[in-house]
């Protein structure tokens, strides 16, 4: 084992690691804005937010068109240039970037116009502006996109072409959906819709054509060629093909409601090898054959890894994979073993947990083994370790390591799709399979390289069918294929492989899980391409459902293009009988030899009219109940922010097919209600966009608080407060309501919603404290136990689950066996305001605190709002409370003046002058501690309810504490020995033998030398010719002596000896002995002439303070404002003197060179050292 020598790691004044540098082990902390990062974020957005409206428009602004600048656009070009080794001419490059910048500027204007129109859709001026902006945007895109197809540069410009095409399709969809409300006539809208459907095909075919051209261009025979080929395939899948595969969803008439797509294609990281370069001649085809052929999607369960050894080097020699069909609908199956079954070590089992493996950290090993002279040398290319990390949306899961963790990080080439959350939650791909590249060439080389396959996270483990969206399921997620069906490579625009059938019969079966009530009805659509007319038949659990005639879409022998595929369906709706069902698709009535390709099936909700009408009526009643009148000028006082969110959920769950216009109208009213709620809420950032974002406004809190997105209880962000290990360090969240926002003689109310809590304390503080401890049992969920999957495809809550029973009055009607929220989850506290004073700015402190280890809370929808003016008894009560508070404040001021004066004198006595830049020569550590204790006698430096909030005396307290801190710093700087008090363990000390650093009951760290052969030493730089004082505080147990020696390289040695003090000992240059040390210290008090004289006496209580004052102060503040027992622990307030038996000795030393050595040892027994100081004498 190699032992590192860290002797030279000590540096003056800082023997510890840099505290500003933090390494997050196992976490990818760098976030980039590369083309791949941007494209993954866009794909995530298109998969999750593909709904027309201002939200989609502004989302494109945030992700690309309002964010990406010239440097990022240039990066899109450089990415492909490097892959194909072709440079775009400067003119074409500048033209492309200028056009993209122009489109970005224009789209930002379009987005702002859209946002303003959506906020006020009946405004004629805004409607006219929307027509103008659409026409300008459409014209600009129609003109610009051909400029991204410059001859000879089609491939390098491909990724920016796709970005512009995506923008154009989104704008055309906007006019197809909103054009009539913008004032366009039906003929114009239909014309633009025809443009939309035509351009979906045009843009798709162009992108796939030039992708294939570029891919062919980078192919070559050697391993280096394959690496570039695979990189092109992987990166352009992410930046081009994934986006193109979602273009059909822009067809607003085929997909009028939210549509969920899945990408089942796989991408590949390179075989994990070191020195994997062009030296492997002719191996490209061999490596490509290592990639799996088109196949049904399966779910990786486990990898069993085998280890072999070669010339003393262990490596991954082979592995075996187990997997399950989609939905785990069938028994687990095992793949044939890859590589060889080595037996150099026990097999390692990697079992998939959480949401799958999202990251690998691999350690490739290359060794050139010398077998002798001549050509017998052998190269070993293997993998000797990999760490597998598991995805989770909630908490870190322990990784599994095969042998060791490496540095080849899969996230470097397949980054997360969301860098705002940890990679375990923001990941973009899961590990789907591992193959093995195996090669051996006799005595030349041995090669074993696992190759990892990755599938996009949108490919769900199951086939879930909810009621509120169109669900697209790729048929490669089938669990069985018919006898005439095969899986073939997709054409590039389908997001994965597809099925092919050449003879009539069953195509495939899928296991589907219904998350909607079984009464929900659906219609099935099929996206297919066919060289012949045919019939499709469907059945559920063996029960025939639909059959219909479908026409041919392409000629025999033709290439598969976007226009070859058609989406068609059955008109008759149906419903499922079981929550988990087998869906079967068959093809009939066509001649064998023809070709039928099926990409996916789609389940489209067929809304039942009376159900939709009932939902609409209920939503209308709930929305109208929010307001004080029909003109929606004001909110009812009892309408909470949580109430508005629930009404919003009710509106969002309305059918967009049945009552689209009514839904939009109700949505506008709810948004208006939410704006009114925001206007009356005096809290800053009530939706928790951040904590500790600004030092003087918004929320402040402890670092263990987390902000989480909405769940099935909260629509907006909410906070989670965990328990704490120590009452003096509570979990806390607070905010101050500024005096300027408050009205005199008015009652205000704090209210919100608590999902669950234990030992949650809530405070409102002004003249006194309003305090409540809230324990709310968690509901676990608002969803009934009968609902199996109340979550969406990306883990988001499905608030439209039909079993949810919600009452607009927020009264809970719980059926037996179900969970729900009830009134105890709503909390409110009120506080009365007397007269207001902007100069004093007393304000109101809002505090949430947990000081118990088993405490916790989840809360949100917080509001602080005006309730009513004070009159009668409540007015008299607040005036009385205000007067009482002012009387107490005056008494506090009298005491503070006295205590502050004495504390300041004690602090000033530590220093030479009022600049506080030099200590008195005789200032020692005990004097600094004593002054610090006196400073801590200042009361009300911080609020007793939460000691991080400054109180009325915070200013003077922090002034003196700052000087105390300066004194400590000057004292430490004066000591040229580093870590002389052992507070940092043995850092900066050289150790021989066995020694310990222990923390004693008085919270001091001491060095314990238990054995005579042990030695602790430190090399110290000094100034030759100057005088120094070596001061040591130590304690000797047992027989023998403890020694602290100071010496130079040659001679000039002196030492301090410590024993049990049986008899007096006299040391050179030091007349202090164990027996007379205490006596001498007492004499020093009268002998000193510095400002520290009499310090011991001044430390005691001063008789000038009135004897009755302290109890008066206690009485004054016992009424609602108790002292904080933790406040005395701030700073050095808990300092305790040394226990009896410790002795301080010192000697004078005059070095002749610039280096001295301090050595600590003993002859027998135990030697305990509290501190070692080497102080430079004053000149």
Swiss-Prot record:
- The molecule here is called Pesticidal crystal protein Cry1Ad
Show the coiled coil region(s).
none
**Listed InterPro entries:** Cry1Ac-like_dom-VII, Cry_V, Galactose-bd-like_sf, Pest_crys, Pest_crys_dom-III, Pest_crys_dom_I, Pest_crys_N_sf, Pest_cryst_cen_dom_sf
One biological-process term from Gene Ontology?
A: symbiont-mediated killing of host cell
| Sorted UniProt keywords | Sporulation, Toxin, Virulence
Query: What's this chain's function?
Result: Promotes colloidosmotic lysis by binding to the midgut epithelial cells of many lepidopteran larvae.
Pfam families hit by this protein: Cry1Ac_D5, Cry1Ac_dom-VII, Endotoxin_C, Endotoxin_M, Endotoxin_N
Spell out the family assignment given in the record's similarity comment.
Answer: Belongs to the delta endotoxin family.
Other remarks on record? Answer: Toxic segment of the protein is located in the N-terminus.
**Phylogenetic placement of the source organism:** Bacteria, Bacillati, Bacillota, Bacilli, Bacillales
Under SUPFAM superfamilies, the record lists: delta-Endotoxin (insectocide), middle domain, delta-Endotoxin (insectocide), N-terminal domain, Galactose-binding domain-like
Give a GO molecular function annotation for the protein: toxin activity
């Amino acid at each position: 084992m190699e032992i590192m020598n860290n002797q030279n790691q000590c540096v003056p004044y800082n023997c510890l690691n840099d505290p500003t540098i933090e390494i997050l082990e196992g976490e990818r902390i760098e976030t980039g804005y590369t083309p791949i990062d941007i494209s993954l974020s866009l794909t995530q957005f298109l998969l999750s937010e593909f709904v027309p409206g201002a939200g989609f428009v502004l989302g494109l602004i945030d992700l690309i068109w309002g964010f990406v600048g010239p440097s990022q656009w240039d990066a899109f070009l450089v990415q492909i240039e490097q892959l194909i080794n072709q440079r775009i001419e400067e003119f074409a490059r500048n033209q492309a970037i200028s056009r993209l910048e122009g489109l970005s500027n224009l789209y930002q204007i379009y987005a702002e116009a859209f946002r303003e129109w959506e906020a006020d859709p009946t405004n004629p001026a805004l409607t006219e502006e929307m027509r103008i902006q659409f026409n300008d945007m459409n014209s600009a895109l129609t003109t610009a996109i051909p400029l991204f197809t410059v001859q000879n540069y089609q491939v390098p410009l491909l990724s920016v072409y796709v970005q512009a095409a995506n923008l154009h399709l989104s704008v055309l969809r906007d006019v197809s959906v909103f054009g009539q409300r913008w004032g366009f006539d039906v003929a114009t809208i239909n014309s633009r819709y025809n443009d939309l459907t035509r351009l979906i095909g045009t843009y798709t075919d162009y992108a796939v054509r030039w992708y294939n051209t570029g891919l062919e261009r980078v192919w070559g025979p050697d391993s280096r060629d394959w690496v570039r080929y695979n990189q092109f395939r992987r990166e352009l899948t992410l930046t081009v093909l994934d986006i193109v595969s979602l273009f059909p969803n822009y067809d607003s008439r085929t997909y009028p409601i939210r549509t969920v797509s899945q990408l089942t294609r796989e991408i590949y990281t390179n075989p994990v090898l070191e020195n994997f370069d062009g030296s492997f001649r002719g191996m490209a085809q061999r490596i490509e054959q290592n990639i799996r052929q088109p196949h049904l999607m399966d779910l990786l369960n486990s990898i069993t890894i085998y280890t072999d050894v070669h010339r003393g080097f262990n490596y991954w020699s082979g592995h075996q994979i187990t997997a399950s069909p989609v939905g785990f609908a069938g028994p687990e199956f095992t793949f044939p073993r890859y590589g060889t079954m080595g037996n150099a070590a026990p097999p390692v089992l990697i079992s998939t947990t959480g949401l799958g493996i999202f990251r690998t950290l691999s350690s490739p090993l290359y060794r050139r083994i010398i077998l002798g002279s001549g050509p017998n040398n052998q190269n070993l290319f293997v993998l000797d370790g990999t760490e597998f990390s598991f995805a989770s949306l909630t908490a870190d899961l322990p990784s599994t390591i095969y042998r060791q963790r490496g540095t080849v990080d899969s996230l470097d080439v397949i980054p997360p799709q969301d860098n705002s959350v940890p990679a375990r939650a923001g990941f973009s791909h899961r590990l789907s399979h591992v193959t093995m590249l195996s090669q051996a060439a006799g005595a030349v080389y041995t090669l074993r390289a696992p190759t990892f396959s990755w599938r996009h996270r949108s490919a769900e483990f199951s086939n879930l069918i909810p009621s509120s969206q169109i669900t697209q399921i790729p048929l490669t997620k089938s669990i069985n294929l018919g006898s005439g069906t095969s899986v073939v490579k997709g054409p590039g625009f389908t997001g994965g492989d597809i099925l092919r059938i050449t003879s009539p019969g069953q195509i495939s079966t899928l296991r589907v899980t219904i998350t909607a009530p079984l009464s929900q009805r659906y219609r099935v659509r099929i996206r297919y391409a066919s060289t012949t007319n045919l019939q499709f038949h469907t059945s559920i659990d063996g029960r025939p459902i639909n059959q219909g005639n479908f026409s041919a879409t392409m000629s025999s022998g033709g290439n598969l293009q976007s226009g070859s595929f058609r989406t068609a369906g059955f008109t008759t709706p149906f419903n499922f009988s079981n929550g988990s069902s087998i869906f079967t698709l068959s093809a009939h009535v066509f001649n064998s030899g023809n070709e039928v390709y099926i990409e996916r099936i789609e389940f489209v909700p067929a809304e039942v009219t009376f159900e939709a009408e009932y939902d609409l009526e209920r939503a209308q009643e709930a929305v109208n109940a929010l307001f004080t009148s029909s003109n929606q000028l004001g909110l009812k006082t009892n309408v909470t922010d949580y109430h508005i969110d629930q009404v919003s959920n009710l509106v969002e769950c309305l059918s967009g097919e049945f009552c689209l216009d009514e839904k939009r109208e109700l949505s506008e009213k709810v948004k208006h209600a939410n704006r009114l709620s925001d206007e009356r809420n005096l809290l800053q950032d009530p939706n928790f966009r951040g904590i500790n974002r600004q030092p003087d406004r918004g929320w402040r809190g402890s670092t263990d608080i987390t902000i989480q997105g909405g769940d099935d209880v909260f629509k907006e962000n909410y906070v989670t407060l965990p328990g704490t290990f120590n009452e003096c360090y509570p979990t806390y969240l607070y905010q101050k309501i500024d005096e300027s926002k408050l009205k005199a003689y008015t009652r205000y109310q704090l209210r919100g919603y608590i999902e669950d809590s234990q030992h949650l304390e809530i405070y409102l503080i002004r003249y006194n404290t309003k305090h409540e401890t809230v324990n709310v049992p968690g509901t676990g969920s608002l969803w009934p136990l009968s609902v199996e999957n109340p979550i969406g495809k990306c883990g988001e809550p499905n608030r439209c689950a039909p079993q949810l029973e919600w009452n607009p009055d927020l009264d809970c009607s719980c059926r037996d066996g179900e969970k729900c929220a009830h009134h105890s989850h709503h909390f409110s506290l009120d506080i009365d305001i007397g007269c207001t004073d902007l100069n004093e700015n007393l304000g109101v402190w809002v505090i949430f605190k947990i000081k118990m280890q088993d405490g916790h809370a989840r809360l949100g929808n917080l509001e602080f709002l005006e309730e009513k003016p004070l009159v009668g008894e409540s007015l008299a009560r607040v005036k009385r409370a205000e007067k009482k508070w002012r009387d107490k404040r005056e008494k506090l001021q009298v005491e503070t003046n006295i205590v502050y004066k004495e504390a300041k004198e004690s602090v000033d006595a530590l220093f030479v002058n009022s600049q506080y830049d030099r200590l008195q020569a005789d200032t020692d550590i005990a004097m600094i501690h004593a002054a610090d204790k006196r400073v801590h006698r200042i009361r009300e430096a911080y609020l007793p309810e939460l000691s991080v909030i400054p109180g009325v005396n915070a200013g003077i307290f922090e002034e003196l504490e700052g000087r105390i801190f300066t004194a400590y710093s000057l004292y430490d700087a004066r000591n040229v020995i580093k870590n002389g008090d052992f507070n940092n363990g043995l850092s900066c000390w050289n150790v021989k033998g066995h020694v310990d650093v222990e923390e004693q009951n008085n919270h001091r760290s001491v060095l314990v030398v238990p054995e005579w052969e042990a030695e602790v030493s430190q090399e110290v730089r000094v100034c030759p010719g100057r005088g120094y004082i070596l001061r040591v505080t130590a304690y000797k147990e047992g027989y023998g002596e403890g020694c602290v020696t100071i010496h130079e390289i040659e001679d000039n040695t002196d030492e301090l000896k410590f024993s049990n003090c049986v008899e007096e000992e006299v040391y050179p240059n030091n007349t202090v002995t164990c027996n007379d040390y205490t006596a001498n210290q007492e004499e020093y008090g009268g002998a000193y002439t510095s400002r520290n004289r009499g310090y011991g006496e001044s430390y005691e209580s001063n008789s000038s303070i009135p004897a009755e004052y302290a109890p008066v102060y206690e009485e004054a503040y016992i009424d609602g404002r108790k002292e904080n027992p933790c406040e005395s622990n701030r700073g050095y307030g808990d300092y305790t003197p040394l226990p009896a038996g410790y002795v301080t000795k010192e000697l004078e030393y005059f070095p002749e060179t610039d280096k001295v050595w301090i050595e600590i040892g003993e002859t027998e027994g135990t030697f305990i050292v509290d501190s070692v100081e080497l102080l430079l004498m004053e000149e």
